[in-house]
Amino acid sequence: MKPGIHPEYREIVFVDVSNNFSFKTRSTMATKETIKWEDGNEYPLAKIETSSESHPFYTGTQKIMDTAGRVEKFRQKFGSKAVAKASGDGAAKTAEKKAAAAEAKAAEKPVKKKA
């Protein structure tokens, strides 16, 4: 390795500011703040907003989005406009044309039987 180009790998304390959970690990992160750790030594301090102690995935308090509620909000906001476009004459005519074309193709090709 070339000397002088790599960041310093050192012990650092991360503090989750949402619940004051802290842990010591090693990192190359540079900080100006320090904290006195349980062992009496002073370490660089990095403040984080989410850790394994506060993240919903790890705590089991995940919020499940109510998709039905989101659909209802959309319908209230756009209501008849969105429904009219989706079920308008154009959509019905296109569906009818596709069905007619499929029937015509099926009628043209005779079914071959294996002997």
UniProtKB/Swiss-Prot annotation:
Keywords per UniProt: Ribonucleoprotein, Ribosomal protein
Pfam families, A to Z: Ribosomal_L31 (PF01197)
Molecular function GO labels: structural constituent of ribosome
A GO cellular-component term linked to this record: ribonucleoprotein complex
Keyword set includes Ribosomal protein: yes
InterPro entries: Ribosomal_bL28/bL31-like_sf, Ribosomal_bL31, Ribosomal_bL31_B, Ribosomal_bL31_sf
GO biological processes: translation
PANTHER family with a match to the protein in the record: 50S RIBOSOMAL PROTEIN L31, CHLOROPLASTIC, LARGE RIBOSOMAL SUBUNIT PROTEIN BL31C
Assembly, per entry: Part of the 50S ribosomal subunit.
NCBIfam families, alphabetized: L31, PRK01678.1
Family membership noted in the UniProt record: Belongs to the bacterial ribosomal protein bL31 family. Type B subfamily.
Name of the protein in its database record: Large ribosomal subunit protein bL31B
